[in-house]
């Protein structure tokens, strides 16, 4: 599929907080299993209570992504 930096991708990993969400590929590292770093607009639930802080990125395998 050859995903590259800057591509818009949809997340297929069902257990992911961002399942079926669209994000932007921030980097691709071919040496590891989860080598595609994807950046999202919304944060996940790991922020401290009462703040909007949280993770904006997560790593995925290329097989867990579809081009959007």
From Swiss-Prot:
<keyword id="KW-0603">Photosystem I</keyword>
<comment type="function">
    <text>Stabilizes the interaction between PsaC and the PSI core, assists the docking of the ferredoxin to PSI and interacts with ferredoxin-NADP oxidoreductase.</text>
</comment>
<dbReference type="GO" id="GO:0009538">
    <property type="term" value="C:photosystem I reaction center"/>
</dbReference>
<dbReference type="Pfam" id="PF02427">
    <property type="entry name" value="PSI_PsaE"/>
</dbReference>
<protein>
    <recommendedName>
        <fullName>Photosystem I reaction center subunit IV</fullName>
    </recommendedName>
</protein>
<dbReference type="InterPro" id="IPR008990">
    <property type="entry name" value="Elect_transpt_acc-like_dom_sf"/>
</dbReference>
<keyword id="KW-0602">Photosynthesis</keyword>
<dbReference type="InterPro" id="IPR003375">
    <property type="entry name" value="PSI_PsaE"/>
</dbReference>
<keyword id="KW-0793">Thylakoid</keyword>
<dbReference type="GO" id="GO:0015979">
    <property type="term" value="P:photosynthesis"/>
</dbReference>
<comment type="similarity">
    <text>Belongs to the PsaE family.</text>
</comment>
<keyword id="KW-0472">Membrane</keyword>
<dbReference type="GO" id="GO:0031676">
    <property type="term" value="C:plasma membrane-derived thylakoid membrane"/>
</dbReference>
